[in-house]
Amino acid sequence: MFMIEVEIFPHRYLKASTTEKFLNKIYDLKTVERVVIHGQPLPKVITYGPARGLPVNHTERKIIHVKGVPVELTVMAGRFWITLSDDSELDKLDEICKEMFPFGYNLRVGKFLKDRPTVTDYIKYGEDGVFLINEMDRRLIGMVDPRSRMANSVTVVEKEEKEE
């Protein structure tokens, strides 16, 4: 199966509202398979130092809604890696970026995400779990943090199949 990966790098960190609008627009595209948001973490609590354990009340750590699915924003969006099933909608993706990021952005096509199980996948899920992921949903490959629960780090937004 031919997949294309696109990196979108806005020239500024995005607020939660802009991230929500952007994600909803790109999920309207038919060829979008997977979106990974990368950026500065927005922790719930301070993890080190004299204030360790105190809550962090960051204004941008919010629950956004992407196609009706609530997604907890745990990073300040600074980069998006988008997997497309083909390159037919690259121009539409570029138009969405021009509309949403008047301050500028970079759009690159390349290889940014894992497509084979990693050692971390085997540690987290075990050999049987990796086999199941390979058979069921390959979008989850390479999407693990060995120290986190999957429910905290990955949200699946299902695409609506439009009947024609």
Curated annotation (Swiss-Prot):
This is Methyl-coenzyme M reductase I operon protein D. MCR is composed of three subunits: alpha, beta, and gamma. The function of proteins C and D is not known. Keywords: Methanogenesis. One of its GO terms (biological process) is methanogenesis. It comes from Methanocaldococcus jannaschii (strain ATCC 43067 / DSM 2661 / JAL-1 / JCM 10045 / NBRC 100440) (Methanococcus jannaschii). It comes from the Archaea. Pfam families: MCR_D (PF02505).
